[in-house]
């Protein structure tokens, strides 16, 4: 199989900038990963971003309960060391994934069980705020609120 695609080397000279559209959780996590590979990361969001964990127009799902399953929690902890402890100190609940919740499947509650994996129950507001605060501690990252993309 032949291809006309020829990869080119990324120029080493000059600053490299990543631009991320959106400061919701997906954009914040993308910006965090980009910060490891770019000299500057700019995040643009149309909303005013609150200084505290409060509702914002661009994240209407923020009032719903959120669960961060074990693998996701571990990945976030790797990106932001100490995140889990900080969230728990602010009211999030860390529990065994099998013991900390009940499952209703096809009209029947299933028995709890020890899964050996820790999941986190946390408000979307708190999770997004804590991730944004930690991301802004990185001098390579800037977030511009009230900016149309």
Task: Please annotate each region the language model reported.
Residues 2-13, 37, 85-86, 110-111:
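Domain-scale detector for complete catalytic domains at protein termini or as standalone homologs
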């Amino acid at each position: 199989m032949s291809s006309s695609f020829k990869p080119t080397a990324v120029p080493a000279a000059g600053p490299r900038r990543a631009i991320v559209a959106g400061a919701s959780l997906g954009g914040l996590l993308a910006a965090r990963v980009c910060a490891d590979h770019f000299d500057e990361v700019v995040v643009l969001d149309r909303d005013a971003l609150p200084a505290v964990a409060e509702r914002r127009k661009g994240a209407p799902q923020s009032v719903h309960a959120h669960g961060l399953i074990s693998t996701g929690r571990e990945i976030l902890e790797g990106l932001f060391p100490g995140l889990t402890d900080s969230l728990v100190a602010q009211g999030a609940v860390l529990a065994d994934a099998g013991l900390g919740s009940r499952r209703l499947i096809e009209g029947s509650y299933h028995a709890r069980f020890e899964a050996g994996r820790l999941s986190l129950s946390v408000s979307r507001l708190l999770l997004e705020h804590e991730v944004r605060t930690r991301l802004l501690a990185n001098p390579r990252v800037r977030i511009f609120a009230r900016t149309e993309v």
